[in-house]
Amino acid sequence: MADESGKKIELTIGDDILHFTVGLAAYNNCLNAMTESNKVAPSFNFAMSTVHPDDKETLTKWLDQGLATDIAGHLMTEFRPKVQITVKA
């Protein structure tokens, strides 16, 4: 179930509107679980753990079409703050 204290994110996938609540713990858990040869399962779990319960069945329809990494990528991009980081040498 989605962490109610996180950032609310709405994704439109095809004609479906899905609602997610992404918190820092879910974001970090997904990144920490990813390896060079294991990206799909953490992406799937991240999406399923952050989606609103009412949208879970619809999300499963899209995840079953191989979109786990795409959906997780959009959620992660939207969750992160938009900042410019520069390095001074």
Give names to the regions the model predicted.
Residues 2-6, 14-16, 21-89:
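Short, surface-exposed, charged amphipathic helix/loop patches that serve as local interaction elements
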